[in-house]
Amino acid sequence: MNYVEITMMINHELEPFIADILNEVGANGVVIEDSLELQKGRIETFGEIYELNPDDFPEEDVRVKVYFSELDYDASVIEQIKEKVDALNDVDVTRLEFSTHTVQEEDWANEWKNHFHAFKVSDKFVIVPSWESYDGLQDGEHAIHLDPGMAFGTGDHATTSMCLKLIEKYVEKGQSIVDVGTGSGILSIAAHKLGAKPIKALDLDSVAVKVAEDNFEKNDCLDAIQAEPGNLLKGETEKRDVIFANILAHIVDMMIDDSYALLNDNGLLITSGIIEEKEEMIIDHLKGVGYTIVEVMRDSGWVAIAARKEA
């Protein structure tokens, strides 16, 4: 079977949200090539730094390759993508360009392995693609096995990596978790690795829920994490110790009141996906409902916040 490859050029602000959009329009796979990757180090199977090939990356901004089977492809999909991007009110979209061509199935399948390798995302977590073995774990480190491109959250973007750093710092064994907008399931997997339970992973997109379940299975935690479709915290009644929310700022803003009501005393909200321009608005709302700000992290124009519901 052949595939239609749509190549998109986008600005960095759009990158954290593009994979979910492409899932919603039925993409079979996504490869994201970020020009900033050339500035980062990576680790191979035995821990050594390896060199990225500049020819594999755009000189600026972000190149996204999205794949559809020829049987499923409809030319209207580009208009669908544009409409969903237009609906992202908090994102400054300065570049959105498209081109298409047909590729052989074997070429498409190999794209994943050319662009995603094991890397250490924080002190305790190493992200490992499912086709690679990794023997370099040190004491206290945990491997998170993922397939990239199917839902947002490979740990490589600032929003996800900051969440992981806050999780490893504050989440404790035996704490109950709800993960709002789970995407790839990476944050739930990290919490499980630290001994948290029970864990519930929610996502409005049923495709993302399936992706998360696949990744839970890869990490031997499918039975330990309850994954299901969910619209933020609507309908949730069981109190939790920690809530994760790596989603857009205006969506975070919508769920702050519900999150406070759902947390146990001394419970923690860990949230990211917030652009710096929205930081003050989110912090003011958090404080307004009673949260105490525990920590604020910033990276590449993005903000992550840990906020506690004091007893």
Curated annotation (Swiss-Prot):
Family statement drawn from the similarity comment of this UniProt entry: Belongs to the methyltransferase superfamily. PrmA family.
One Gene Ontology cellular component: cytoplasm
Entry-linked PANTHER family: ELECTRON TRANSFER FLAVOPROTEIN BETA SUBUNIT LYSINE METHYLTRANSFERASE
Reactions mediated catalytically: L-lysyl-[protein] + 3 S-adenosyl-L-methionine = N(6),N(6),N(6)-trimethyl-L-lysyl-[protein] + 3 S-adenosyl-L-homocysteine + 3 H(+)
Listed EC numbers: 2.1.1.-
CDD domains linked to this entry: AdoMet_MTases
Binding residues annotated for S-adenosyl-L-methionine, in chain numbering: 160, 181, 203, 246
Alphabetical GO biological process terms: methylation
Name of the top EC class for this enzyme: transferase
Alphabetic keyword roster: Cytoplasm, Methyltransferase, S-adenosyl-L-methionine, Transferase
UniProt GO MF annotations: protein-lysine N-methyltransferase activity
Name under which the protein is recorded: Ribosomal protein L11 methyltransferase
Lineage: superkingdom: Bacteria
Upper taxonomic lineage: Bacteria, Bacillati, Bacillota, Bacilli, Bacillales
Role this protein plays: Methylates ribosomal protein L11.
Subcellular location(s) per record: Cytoplasm
Pfam families, alphabetized: PrmA
Gene of this entry: prmA
Primary localisation category: cytoplasm
HAMAP family reported in the protein's UniProt record: Methyltr_PrmA
